[in-house]
Swiss-Prot record:
Residues 551-564 have a biased composition (Pro residues). The keyword Disulfide bond does not apply. Residues 846-893 are annotated as: CoCUN. Residues 213-243, 273-339, 394-433, 472-564, 793-820 are annotated as: Disordered. Disulfide bonds: none annotated. InterPro entries: KH_dom_type_1_sf, KH_N4BP1_1st, KH_N4BP1_2nd, RNase_Zc3h12_NYN, UBA_N4BP1, UBA_N4BP1_C, ZC3H12/N4BP1_RNase_Reg. Proteolytically cleaved by CASP8 downstream of TLR3 or TLR4, leading to its inactivation. Mainly cleaved at Asp-488 by CASP8. Cleaved by caspase-like protein MALT1, leading to its inactivation. Mono- and polyubiquitinated on the CoCUN region. Monoubiquitinated by NEDD4. Polyubiquitinated, leading to its degradation by the proteasome. Sumoylated with SUMO1, abrogating polyubiquitination and subsequent degradation. Desumoylated by SENP1, leading to accumulation in PML nuclear bodies. This is NEDD4-binding protein 1.
Length: 893
């Protein structure tokens, strides 16, 4: 029932007159009212502090507009509300109609300040209501829950899609993939405001941006409403949205390749599929059949009437369909054009997930299992799970499988067969056939290996919907047991085919692709060479005993009755050991190789033993090391742990790793974050500050922390960065960048550093890592130990070999987990110096006369009384040292 027209007058601050004049058109369009700024009544001097305003329209609309105007003129609250960036389409998409509806519902003034940030002002009640709405939207978006079963989810999806496409813009695709519960909330928000704009004498539309005139009449009647619908439909047809553009492009692709065979999702037979090419898919359908596939029902509005289709036939009809007549929609459009839309929908879904980096086989498998009408976010989760499962299974190579492996899994055959059945046999009869098939095939020794030794040829297959009847086995079978199944892809010989078994393959391609045999010829399991590489044998032997030993089997007679595909598939697929992957990419990628290395377990082990005090502080650029180990694609925390363990084994105990704090957040590109936690608990990891402000990250430059710590501790920075931007900051930083950067490289999980960090003419690694003070202390001591050898600070060439061969470093056994260590004799001899001092004879001690002479000489050099006590302590602590220069150095330190 239309509301009564009312007239309301009220006052507002005079200084807001200019603001109201500028906002009048927007206010009238928002609330469907007429606004007049009357100003001050009479010619008063000076001008009053308030002016008069007048509103005319429906009673509820006038009340809402009045509250809104009061809120922008005299706001009680002004706040900001954050929301996820993925929800930005709600407030700016669909021509901002959802934002306008939120303003109409709450009477608060809302504006988008930035992506992820809204500004809210108005009365206290209006601001609280607006914030409550926004927080409810965020909760529904993050929970991503489906509607209860008693609510018609497909109807809500259809209504929302119709509404969004009627106001199409660049955010249409983002709006269509929102959760259904959020779609319902947005629809109720927009539909709840329609009653505000109905009056006795005029009808004002929310989306109309033109301000209504008081003199406008509503006498146009039903014809004007029909014309308005037609105009809206024309404008929607002209809107070039990403959906329509993609649809047009796919129309061209499919029309140019008429030989492409497509198995529809709805399970139509090939004959019905061929007949569907003669039909025209109209843009809009509102029939009940649309409820089956409501996700991504893309429009095909640019197919002209009477246009020839690829087979040369005309369109199904040239009748004009009135969009405002629901009867015509249900009677004329429900059976027609359905297959083409589902085909388009299916291919667009597949291409969408392929662009995200997932293989086509995995995407199609998940879509077949859950259906194309499932929420894309749910499909994405399942695709990610399937992808991870296949990558984990890839770690286990295929082995020979014996009949007990197939028989022990008969319980799971039924579910797989139900999903992949190609016959419309009743379930009870079908299960009986399955059981007989399993008993027959369980006697055969199935084998899935890289080197196939039988002559049986099996082509890869694809699943077909229930109800589509198909001859799987040919009527003629020769002695070589050739099995031809419906395939996609290109034809190839069995010897050159992919070694990985029967798998799901993509739709839309023609031809046949042969796979490696899955059955032995005449029942024999022939094996003339090992089935697996040497490095994979132990893993297989642990699971199945012996993988490569020949197992002769009795000669079974060839199969006489033809068996359908559904009964064959479970035995073949279940004949894999450990769930090995049924898909392998044709080419190897760096990402795949990196993920394979992560499957090899690595444990950070830092032994609790004293270190060496002669080594410099090690400052590790954690981000640089992690990115390098992750092949520039992942932040690999394992690389940091490997670097720390390397220096720990050298004897370093002063090790610091700097990593930005935001790297501790969950991220699919950050792997094995538990290493960061472990290092932080040990006090080795330091997190540089970072914070989030309005959805934007503010992080300090971690390289500055590296340079500051290296400057204070005299340490070495382990990084491959050149710090070019910091060369001019200070002299000390320039010295660090020039002389104290240690570069590195990774070979898999092996951490390696150069023997000559500063070039061929620079110091060796041992000298580079030692403190300078230690070199001064140890030189006289090594000179006094002839059996150990002369200590050469330059390490240009070894001077004297260690007398006792037992002190030579033991031969290093290289393993996959042990880091690479330098093998210089000086480095090892110095590391084992305490143990050496027990065996070689010590030189004679100083006599009392020599000690007195040295004391007098030192007192002449250091006459202070404080140094006198230190001189006595040094002489007592070093009874063998006779070098005056060495003793002087000790006094200085």
């Amino acid at each position: 029932m239309a509301a009564r027209v009312v007239l309301d007058e009220f006052t507002a601050p005079a200084e807001k007159a200019a603001l109201l004049e500028r906002s009048r058109g927007r206010i009238e369009a928002l609330f469907g009212v007429g606004l007049a700024v009357l100003g001050a009544l009479g010619a008063e001097e000076p001008l009053p502090a308030r002016i008069w305003l007048q509103l005319r329209g429906a009673q509820e609309a006038v009340h809402s507009a009045k509250e809104y105007i009061k809120g922008i003129c005299e706001p009680e609250l002004e706040e900001k509300e954050c929301y996820p960036k993925a929800m930005h389409c709600i407030f700016v998409g669909a021509q901002s109609l959802f934002l306008k509806s939120l303003i109409q519902d709450t009477c608060a003034d809302l504006c988008v300040l930035d992506t992820g940030l809204l500004g809210i002002r108005g009365s206290a009640e209006a601001v609280v209501m607006a914030r409550s709405h926004i927080q409810q939207f965020v909760k529904l978006f993050e929970s991503n829950e489906n509607l209860p079963s008693n609510q018609r989810e497909s109807e809500i999806k259809r209504e929302f899609r119709q509404f969004v496409e009627a106001h199409a813009d660049s955010y249409t695709m983002d709006l269509l993939i929102l959760p259904t519960s959020l779609k319902k909330e947005l629809l109720s928000l927009t539909q709840g405001e329609e009653s505000l704009f109905e009056t006795d004498d005029d009808v004002i539309t929310v989306g109309d941006v033109r301000p209504p005139e008081y003199t406008q009449s509503a006498a146009t009647g039903p014809s004007s409403a029909r014309d308005e619908v037609v105009v809206q439909e024309d404008s929607r047809n002209k809107a070039r949205t990403p959906v329509s553009e993609l649809t047009k492009h796919m129309d061209t692709v499919f029309s140019s390749s008429p030989d492409v065979l497509f198995v529809p999702v709805n399970g139509l037979s090939p004959d019905e599929d061929a007949l569907s090419k003669d039909r025209v898919c109209h843009k809009r359908r509102s029939s009940d059949t649309e409820e089956r596939h409501t996700k991504k029902q893309f429009s095909l509005e640019n197919v002209p009437e009477g246009e020839l289709l690829p087979d040369g036939k005309g369109s199904a009809g040239n009748e004009v369909i009135d969009l405002s007549d629901p009867a015509s929609n249900s009677t004329n459009l429900s059976p027609d054009g359905k297959d083409t839309t589902e085909e388009m929908e299916y291919n667009i879904l597949v291409n969408f997930f392929k662009t995200m980096g997932y293989s086509q086989e995995i995407v199609e498998k998940v879509i077949r299992e859950y259906g194309p009408s499932t929420e894309p976010l749910l499909l994405l989760e399942e695709i990610e799970k399937e992808n991870k499962r296949l990558q984990e299974d890839r770690d286990f190579p295929p082995c020979t499988v014996y009949p007990d492996a197939s028989q022990s899994r008969n319980a799971g055959v039924g579910s797989t067969t139900n999903e992949l059945t190609a016959d419309s046999t009743p379930k009870k009869a079908q299960s009986h056939t399955e059981q007989s098939m399993v008993e027959r095939f369980s006697q055969l020794p199935f084998k899935d290996s890289k080197h196939c030794t039988s002559n049986c040829k099996v082509n890869s297959f694809r699943t077909v919907p229930v109800g589509q009847k198909q001859e799987i086995w040919g009527s003629k079978q020769n002695s070589s047991c050739t099995v031809d199944l419906e395939t996609d892809g290109h034809s190839a010989s069995a010897a050159s085919a992919s070694p990985k078994d029967i798998s799901f393959v993509s739709r839309g391609a023609s031809g046949h692709q042969q796979r490696n045999p899955a059955f032995p010829e005449n029942g024999f399991q022939q094996q003339t060479e090992p089935l697996l590489p040497n490095n994979t044998k132990p893993a297989c032997e642990k699971r199945s005993g012996s993988c490569s030993s020949p197992q002769p089997k009795p000669n079974y007679p060839p199969l006489s009755p033809p068996l359908p595909l559904p009964q064959l598939l479970p035995s073949v697929t279940e004949a894999r050991l450990g769930g090995s992957s049924d898909h392998i990419d044709s080419s190897v990628t760096g990402v795949q190789r990196f993920r394979d290395t992560l499957k090899i377990p690595y444990k950070l082990e830092l032994k609790n033993e004293p270190g060496r005090a002669d080594l410099k502080h090690i400052v590790i650029d954690g981000s640089n090391v992690a990115i390098t180990h992750g092949l520039k694609k992942f932040f690999s925390c394992r690389g940091i742990a490997i670097a720390v363990e390397y220096f720990w084994k050298l004897g370093n105990r002063n090790i610091t790793v700097f990593v930005p704090q935001w790297r501790t957040r969950r991220d699919p590109n950050i792997t094995e974050q538990h290493f960061l936690t472990q290092l932080q608990e040990l006090g080795i990891l330091s997190l540089t500050p970072a914070r989030m402000v309005f959805g934007e990250r503010i992080a300090s430059h971690d390289d500055r922390f590296l340079l500051h710590l290296a400057d204070k501790t005299g340490g070495i920075i382990v990084t491959n960065d050149n710090f070019r931007e910091f060369v001019t900051e200070s002299v000390s930083w320039r010295e660090i960048i020039t002389k104290r950067l240690l570069q590195y490289t990774f070979v898999g999980d092996i951490f390696m550093v150069p023997d000559d960090p500063l070039g061929r003419n620079g110091p060796r690694l041992e000298e580079f890592l030692r403190k300078e003070a230690f070199l001064r202390h140890m030189q006289p001591l090594l000179n006094a130990l002839p059996s150990v050898g002369t200590f050469d600070p330059g390490f240009r060439s070894p001077s004297t070999q260690v007398a006792n061969n037992s002190h030579q470093p033991p031969p290093r056994i290289q393993t996959s987990s042990s880091p690479w260590l330098p093998q210089q004799s000086h480095f090892t001899a110095l590391a084992t110096l305490p143990s050496m001092q027990q065996n070689p004879p010590l030189p004679a001690q100083r006599s009392s006369a020599e000690t007195s002479e040295l004391r007098e000489a030192l007192l002449k050099i250091f006459p202070d009384s404080e140094q006198k006590l230190k001189i006595d302590q040094i002489l007592a602590a070093h009874p063998y040292m006779k070098d005056l220069n060495a003793l002087s150095a000790l006094v200085l330190d």
